[in-house]
Amino acid sequence: MEKQYLTVTALTRYIKTKIEYDPHLQSVWLKGEISNFKNHSRGHMYFTLKDENARIAAVMFAGHNRNIKFRPENGMKVLVKGKISVYEASGSYQIYIQDMQPDGIGNLHLAYEQLKVRLEEEGLFSQVYKKTIPPYAKTIGVITSPTGAAIRDIITTIKRRYPIGNVIVFPVLVQGESAAPSIVQAIRTANEMEEIDVLIVGRGGGSIEELWAFNEEMVARAIFKSEIPIISAVGHETDFTIADFVADLRAPTPTAAAELAAPNIIELQEKVLQRTLRLQRAMRELVHKKEEKLQVLQKSYAFRYPRQVYEQKEEQLDRALEQLVLAKERYIDKKVNQLKQLSFYLEKHHPSQKIMQTKVAVETLQKQLQREMQTLLQTKEFAFVRAAQKLEALSPLKVMMRGYGLVYDEEKQVLKSVKDVSLGDAVSVQLQDGILDCSVSGIEERELNNGK
């Protein structure tokens, strides 16, 4: 019988078919530890599930993982549900996960803690970014369900405390998958309206699942970016959501949020009354002081004897006018004297006088320079004549005219001693009127006394 060889592809597909048709492998529950976690840009998750003795490749496509609330991380222990199949390209089997939750802690609780840590590290909870709630808001925006008890409590409280205030309700979903986008859109819409002074964002109490929209990251970031101050009012006093940490002010209940947003008109009226009374009291005191001052003035000499006061002032005015005239005359005399002194100074230091003096000085210096140059020239001419006479007396030609000559060897070097030549050497003798070419035929050494 001839053997039939399978291709690798055929064998792999056979094994894959066997696995996929096994009902025990199409609904598998596993628990293990995540490692080699990778979140693909397209949203798919790839990682390994392992325990102490084995490991299996795992895939969770974007269509399934978008529903999980927490972020898978390496080292996290999880419970997963999925099916086993074969990845033909590598011939390896792996689990395709359809659902996943943390092992030992609730899915939502883990997601809550993870987001809380991450946003706190980013600074979204910092007091630096908290906006001040206006004390007298004219218009209050309310973002909540239009049918819940929270909206009734908020509106009732605002109308009771601050009936002159305006309330604008932005109806939203407060639970379910569409709740978070609904809340985010309402916050954006409110920020586009200039008349809103403060926003209340919240709902009544409920389970963590029912309150989860206020733990969504998109809601937290929308609250943080809001230009309008936001008061969070989610659930009961013991409920804390991510929205509470990001909001500018947290109220334990919707009713408390309304009390924080709306001032108490009775208290305001009391304040107005107190300030009115203080103002009236201050005005009475001021009028009383002015009346006392008026009475003092009425009793003064000026009010009792106005004619005498007038005459005194007339006399003081006359004296003041006389002093003014005298002061004017003294001032004019002073300025005239200053003008005379200045004119004398200018005349004395006029440029024409300075130019004339400078011209005379220059002419004097020119004459002095000419005299000194003439004297120097004569001195130099006399010194030149004497130097010329000395040079002429020392000239070799003068010496030759007295019968002397210069003797040169064959190399045209002047002979100064008979020791510089030998018998038969050719020499030349320069006289005043020519040169003699000679030959040494004899040498006699002797010393001359006084040139003889």
Swiss-Prot record:
Q: What is its EC number?
A: 3.1.11.6
Q: Which UniProt keywords apply?
A: Cytoplasm, Exonuclease, Hydrolase, Nuclease
So what does this thing catalyse? Exonucleolytic cleavage in either 5'- to 3'- or 3'- to 5'-direction to yield nucleoside 5'-phosphates
Q: Does the keyword Secreted apply?
A: no
Keyword Transferase (UniProt): no
> What is the protein name given in its UniProt record?
Exodeoxyribonuclease 7 large subunit
Q: Which GO terms describe its molecular function?
A: exodeoxyribonuclease VII activity; nucleic acid binding
Q: What does this protein do?
A: Bidirectionally degrades single-stranded DNA into large acid-insoluble oligonucleotides, which are then degraded further into small acid-soluble oligonucleotides.
What Pfam families does its record include?
Exonuc_VII_L, tRNA_anti_2
What GO CC annotations are associated with the protein? cytoplasm; exodeoxyribonuclease VII complex
Q: Which GO terms describe its biological process?
A: DNA catabolic process
Predominant localisation class: cytoplasm
Which family does the record assign?
Belongs to the XseA family.
Task: Give the record's subunit note.
Answer: Heterooligomer composed of large and small subunits.
Q: Where are the transmembrane segments?
A: none
What NCBIfam families would the database entry show? xseA
Task: Name the domain of life.
Answer: Bacteria
Q: Where is the protein found, in the record's own terms?
A: Cytoplasm
What InterPro entries is this protein classified in? Exonuc_VII_L (IPR003753), Exonuc_VII_lsu_C (IPR020579), OB-fold_nuc-bd_dom (IPR025824)
Q: Where is the signal peptide?
A: none
